[in-house]
Amino acid sequence: MSVITSSGNVISLDLDDTDIYQHFEDSKSCAKIILSQINSDRIYDRFLKNQKDMIILDIGANIGLFTLYAKDSASHIFSVEPTPSHQKLFEKINGPYDNVTLVKAALSGTDESMNFYICDYNSTCNSLIDRGSDVIEVEGLTFKSLLEKYNIDHVDFCKIDIEGSEMLAITEETLKPVYDKIDRMFIEVHATYSGPDMRWEDNLVINRRKIETVLQNVGYKYEILPSRYNDTIHVFKDIHTK
């Protein structure tokens, strides 16, 4: 099992490591789905293939598969992940690389300790959104504080996949201060509610439109990328860089 990077290099994953092996065998981890998006679907190639010397943010880094994919395109990647078990695997997978920094925190709307919910049916769904799961306390960082803490002056590409937490982290108040610093984003939007009065698919559309409004009001342009649920937004500044 391996990751095919943005430059086409093949990096084998150490399945002799019991923790890594068990994570990929655990149906609740979605690790194989994430790997398929990277290796087979190549969903990030349009933005990163054969690029060099980029500053990249990996928000919702999980165990670091996207970070591993993108490291060839980066002068440095800052990977944000609040789940302790994912952090442990991330360090095993990306530990050898000098251009990778793991940020043990959650992107959020405020700079304070936050309740973070560990999903019992799918560890990929861990989130700041309460889905009735176990709770831990994690550090919360806004975009502005994240960039200031790590002395990041410019971001070429920011991937965000944080399982509903985007509804708290991506607001006009958090995005305006960093508009001049973040050029391009790839945002996966998630449903944060489902019940007898609303399907999760309908809630996802509502959430996506809220994010679209934020992006427009801040000054970004965007497009909805083709996907099963139309849940992925490509965010950019200049129509000529689309």
Provide a role label for each language-model segment.
Residues V80, V103, K159-I160:
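Active-site-adjacent beta-strand anchor residues
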Residues M1-V80, P84-K92, Y150, G195-K242:
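S-adenosyl-L-methionine
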Residues A70, F90, F116, A169-I170:
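Hydrophobic packing residues within well-ordered alpha-helices of enzyme cores
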Residues F90-V100:
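Short, conserved SAM-binding/catalytic segment
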Residues S73-S75, P96, T174-V178:
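Glycine-rich, phosphate-binding/catalytic loops in enzymes
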Residues H76, N99-T101, E137, K221:
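Conserved beta-strand segments of alpha/beta enzyme cores
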Residues K49, I55-T67, S85, V135-D197:
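Active-site segment flanking the S-adenosylmethionine/decSAM binding pocket
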Residues D16-R46, V103, S108-S145, K149-Y150:
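Glycine-rich adenosyl-binding loop in Rossmann-like folds that engage adenosine-containing cofactors
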